[in-house]
Amino acid sequence: IGTTTISGVVLEKNETQKARILEAKTIENGSFLATDSDWERIQDAENIVKKSRQMLDDFLDRYPEVEKIGLTGQMHGIVYIDKEGTCVSPLYTWQDARGSLCEEKNGSLTEEIQQTCKVQAASGYGMVTHIYNLRHNLIPDTAVSFCTIMDYFGMQLTGRKEVLVHASNAASFGFFDAQKNTFMTEELYKMGVEEPWLPKVCTGIEALGSYRERIVTTAIGDNQASFLGAAGNEKNTLLVNM
């Protein structure tokens, strides 16, 4: 699930476990929402889910032997989720610039984070967006947590109510300790973010549930997915992009 396009691919493994592409398809995302603020870059999360589900259903109808459904997509951005696992906000994309706005005497939020927490977090990172939204009362009252758009798609497919985010996507939010695979709760607390907001994190590819009798797995970041697509999962592999 990208920012400008949504893509799907049907893969089949042969006897050597090499993946063979049976079909690939890309459509326009076209879900940006009009806004009065030129720094705001938000998308219609439910429209994205609708388009993604239509593509998936088309594949499943024509390839009934499919066994598993893997997910990936645009990193950094967040949608807010209520206790029923339903999206209650637009998708705040990685292009959103609210974290770079100058506020009173403190400069921008990203500068304040660097000074207060010694953490490098760019505008568009989920935690930066969340901190800004907290301070400006922009979060819906029913929201209890947040996740990426592909995490939300997985929840909608499986009926899951609790957010589960792969470490690759959790790290893209910012304020994440990649060595410990946990959020920096002490630093987040300094910025007003309490632990109950934070989504549960997994380090492996886990089963979220099922859709049309196929296993749906946790979404990984598009950066990681592109590496696997180009280099595979062989150990000690280096990929150089020019």
Where do the language-model regions lie?
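Carbohydrate-associated surface elements
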Residues: 96
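Short beta-strand segments
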Residues: 70-73, 147-150, 219, 240-242
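N-terminal glycine/serine-rich phosphate-binding loop of ATP-dependent small-molecule kinases
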Residues: 1-89, 115, 142, 199, ...
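Gly/Ser/Thr-rich active-site cleft segment
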Residues: 1-3, 114-223
